Amino acid sequence: ADLGHTDTIVIGDCGLPVPAGVPKIDLALKPGTPSFLDVLTEVLKYMEVEKIHIASEMESKNPATWQKMQELFEGKEQILSDHEAFKAAAKTAKAVIRTGEITPYANIILHAGVIF
């Protein structure tokens, strides 16, 4: 409820480290549940996204998820970085949503947009 323009939230797999001081919303019930894509799909119903940040490793290590990101965010600005830079960027997020996802690099930083 406290997400303003340009603020960020992270949706991550179950292995993504949550930076100290960043609130964690832990949805992981068991390996694979809920999935990264299920959680992302629900969040996108209620959030206007201006741009995304994903790790470049996703393209080669998790091509199915990479392809889905390209489809979901076609026309949106995409920040690509290595995984270490991604984790550094997560330190400024308003929250990290931890899923039960167990595929590699299934993580995204969503930058809040505005609806007008």
Annotate the PLM regions.
Residues 1-5, 10-11, 15-18, 22-39, ...:
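N-terminal intrinsically disordered, cationic/polar leader segments
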Residues 12, 55, 111:
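Conserved residues at the C-terminal ends of beta-strands
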Residues 41-85:
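Mid-chain, well-packed structural core segment of small domains
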Residues 73, 112-116:
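Short, well-ordered alpha-helical segments in soluble proteins
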Residues 105-110:
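Non-catalytic C-terminal interaction segments of nucleic acid-processing enzymes
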